[in-house]
Amino acid sequence: MMLNSDTMELDLPPTHSETESGFSDCGGGAGPDGAGPGGPGGGQARGPEPGEPGRKDLQHLSREERRRRRRATAKYRTAHATRERIRVEAFNLAFAELRKLLPTLPPDKKLSKIEILRLAICYISYLNHVLDV
């Protein structure tokens, strides 16, 4: 069975990911991790670096404020961006592997991630039907 994403119809409710708004591109680079308001730096004054005078001030801060200040360091942001890049690459590799298993016309047709998932659902349903008959 060859699947064609143009004529495929499913009874699935529409989701915000169907809008193809570019969220799949957002995870590849350095950016805010969503944990604190305002993104990197957040417009807040940074605390003193370890070893600088004023280190004792950090002991009086709430746990959440200490976390925000730790996440504001360049070292933390760089490490987070690296982890996120690795995660996104693994995610994209998994989609590429799934895409290779789906028969489509033409075989090299470029599909979005949502199209890959929907075609996989249809193909698995078709294979189940073939096994049941």
Swiss-Prot record:
Ranges for region Disordered: 1-79
GO molecular function: DNA-binding transcription activator activity, RNA polymerase II-specific; DNA-binding transcription factor activity, RNA polymerase II-specific; protein dimerization activity; RNA polymerase II cis-regulatory region sequence-specific DNA binding; RNA polymerase II transcription regulatory region sequence-specific DNA binding; sequence-specific double-stranded DNA binding
Disulfide-bond pairs as recorded: none
UniProt biased composition (Basic residues): 66-79
SUPFAM superfamilies: HLH, helix-loop-helix DNA-binding domain (SSF47459)
Coiled-coil blocks: none
Location within or outside the cell: Nucleus
Biased composition range(s): Basic and acidic residues: 52-65
Biased composition (Gly residues): 25-45
Domain bHLH: residue ranges: 75-127
Keywords (A to Z) from UniProt: Developmental protein, Differentiation, DNA-binding, Nucleus, Transcription, Transcription regulation
Signal peptide segment: none
GO biological process, one term: cell differentiation
Main subcellular location: nucleus
Gene Ontology CC: chromatin; nucleus
A Pfam family per the record: HLH
Source taxon at top rank: Eukaryota
Function summary: May serve as DNA-binding protein and may be involved in the control of cell-type determination, possibly within the developing nervous system.
Subunit structure: Efficient DNA binding requires dimerization with another bHLH protein.
Protein name: Helix-loop-helix protein 1
The species this protein was found in: Homo sapiens (Human)
